[in-house]
Every structure is written in C-alpha cells, then in structure tokens.
Amino acid sequence: MTVTLCSPTEDDWPGMFLLAAASFTDFIGPESATAWRTLVPTDGAVVVRDGAGPGSEVVGMALYMDLRLAVPGEVVLPTAGLSFVAVAPTHRRRGLLRAMCAELHRRIADSGYPVAALHASEGGIYGRFGYGPATTLHELTVDRRFARFHADAPGGGLGGSSVRLVRPTEHRGEFEAIYERWRQQVPGGLLRPQVLWDELLAECKAAPGGDRESFALLHPDGYALYRVDRTDLKLARVSELRAVTADAHCALWRALIGLDSMERISIITHPQDPLPHLLTDTRLARTTWRQDGLWLRIMNVPAALEARGYAHEVGEFSTVLEVSDGGRFALKIGDGRARCTPTDAAAEIEMDRDVLGSLYLGAHRASTLAAANRLRTKDSQLLRRLDAAFASDVPVQTAFEF
C-alpha cells in the first residue's frame, strides 16, 4: 500500500489514540489527550496513513502545541511544542519520522515561531532534526531522618511557620498566581493553560489501584505538591515545587523535612538547586537520577538570538556565527542585547543547529561543547565571552512535560 502524509481529520483521531496507547507507556486515554488538543493550532498536526479511503490506518503521527517559553532576560517567546510523535512498529525505518518532522517544521516556520521545543522519549533521536538538550532534570533524594538545617538558613527562628498543609484542589487560585510569577522569571518556564491546571489537579486525587492522594504545602511565595510513593511507604515524592523567593524555597523544604512518618523525600529539580547547601550535611541530599529535560530547535536564528537577554558584564563584542543548515550571521552582543544579521563574511565560530539549541537558555556552556568539538572556533577569548554572555543569572529549570 501507499503511505500518505496529511493533516488529520476527526476520523483519524481514534486511530491516533490507538497508536498513542501502543507507543506511550504514560498515555492515560483519549479524555486527557482531547484536553491537550485545545492547544494545537488548526494546521498543527500531521498523520501518515497506510492506504486510502475508510479502511486506511494511521501509522504515524506528530503535532505541535502553541506554547509560551521564558528565556533569559525575563522575555517570553511563542514556542511550538512538539508532542504525540509516534510511528507504528509495523512501519519503522521507512523515513516517516523525518517526513513528519520536516512538514511540521515547515508549518512552524511559516507561522513565525522563533523556537520549537520537545521532550525526547529517547536521547538519540532528535539531534539529527536540529534539537539540542537545553535543560537538565536532576533528582535529589534526601534522607530526612538525619537532615539538619544550617543555623544561617532562612527561617531558622522560633516564629511560626509561613507554610500551610492544604488540599490542592481547594487552593488552585493561589497555585496559579505563584506559578505565573515563577514561570515569567525562570528560563525554561512555560505558561500553563487552564486545561493543564485541570489535569494537574485531577491527578492529585487518589486513583484506585494507582497513585495515592497528593497533598500541598503552601507559602505566600511558593508551593509544593507531594504524595507518598505507590510501593515505598517511607518515600514521599515531590511532583512540583515552585518558589519565587529563596525564603519560600527554604520554608517549603523545612516543612517537607518535617514529614516525620517518611524516611526519604525525593524531587526532580535542576542542577543548581540550593537544597544541599541548606543542610549541615550536604551528602544527605543525594543525586539519584539525571537526564535531559526540554530540547530546543532554533527555527529563526536572528529572531531567537535578538529576543533573549545577555550578561551585561561581558562588554561589547562581535563575531561571525555559522549554523549548519541555518545560515551565517554577524552577531554583535553588548549592553545585554544582541544584533544578528545575515552575512557573507568568513565564520569565526561554527556549530550545528542542535548545539545552538543547547546554548540558548544558558544551561550549557560554549566551552564545554567546544571541548567535545560540537562547537568550533580558534579564538579562546571569544569562547570565554560566549560563556559569559549566554550564562543566565537565574537557574534554568524545566516547567512541565508535554
């Protein structure tokens, strides 16, 4: 049979849900997927059908959602978030994934998005399509039985706690307001639409034979959602902690460490989380897992580089940047901003598009990528300036998976 790539009709969605159920271990059903569909633009999905007419089968699918991503400088960019990408096991190694990505990238570029983003199910797939890992997921597990806070850690006095134990569904408005403040100031922050708040709070309820009920710790400038692990009754897993201030972060952790019926508290956070340094024994906050988080593809190099902010301390400098399959540009950085224009001048620094995606939020250093020969320049001073200019003074974090 002949395969065809096109936009899906309503008749295709049952087949797409079947392919999702077979492809994604965390797929929880059509009802949740239908809610996420509200974030997909009119031309934001493609399918590959095997055959024609009513009997044709969906053997490939991909879509993008209309998202808003915070980047350094407290700038928020329209972002195309790729998701729901799958190829049937019966049709692998036929170029379907490449064809779907190429078509979606064409539509994303035509719609004017400066960047595209995704969460990768496998680490070796999306680099060849121009995506680079731009944030890092970092799991810390704390043995709370022996944890003690430094005397100079915030909130160490004898006054009453500023944190309350609450039920998540009863405090949605406060969570939304805190999250909105957080996501605008943190590179990697994403606007969370109402349908995703609906889903998050629905997941806080206990599921028969599944997850236990979630509880919340609420501070005026932060919150934490946690539940006891399904199989380990001495482990509390924090599913989300958002703090707008250092005081709120410490206050929430004081409350979590106070869960006396637990032995351990785990959280998936970011590599610069100050939690270990709040404790007198940093070893009690162990790194138990680490993985790439958000991946970025720079769709429009000048627009993306001119949109974000840069470190003021670097001073003004200029270079010529060549991005494989992306163009060659005169890049001038100064006073916290960049000017990026096409040029025919000889390149002084070269990289693939995925490398620029990894650099963009500031989580990864140009010098580190140069040491792996992923970024190439003969000018060591330029490399140091790029390190300093692209660095974010606010730690890069991962908002949520999509």
From Swiss-Prot:
Organism source for this protein? Mycobacterium bovis (strain ATCC BAA-935 / AF2122/97)
Q: How does it assemble?
A: Homohexamer; trimer of dimers.
**EC number(s) on record?**
2.3.1.-
Q: Which gene encodes it?
A: eis
Q: GO annotations under biological process?
A: aminoglycoside antibiotic catabolic process
The protein's name is N-acetyltransferase Eis
Q: Which UniProt keywords apply?
A: Acyltransferase, Host cytoplasmic vesicle, Secreted, Transferase
Catalytically driven reaction(s): L-lysyl-[protein] + acetyl-CoA = N(6)-acetyl-L-lysyl-[protein] + CoA + H(+)
* Cited function: Effector that is released into the host cell and affects host immune responses. Acts as an acetyltransferase that acetylates lysine residues of host proteins.
The compartments listed are:
Secreted; Host cytoplasmic vesicle, Host phagosome; Extracellular vesicle, Bacterial extracellular vesicle; Host extracellular space
Q: Which GO terms describe its molecular function?
A: aminoglycoside N-acetyltransferase activity; protein-lysine-acetyltransferase activity
Q: Which residues bind acetyl-CoA?
A: 85-87, 93-98, 121-122
Q: Does the keyword Chaperone apply?
A: no
PROSITE patterns from the xrefs?
GNAT
Q: Which InterPro entries match?
A: Acetyltransf_17 (IPR041380), Acetyltransferase_Eis (IPR051554), Acyl_CoA_acyltransferase (IPR016181), Eis_dom (IPR025559), GNAT_dom (IPR000182), NAcTrfase_Eis (IPR022902), SCP2_sterol-bd_dom_sf (IPR036527)
Q: Which residues form the N-acetyltransferase domain?
A: 3-154
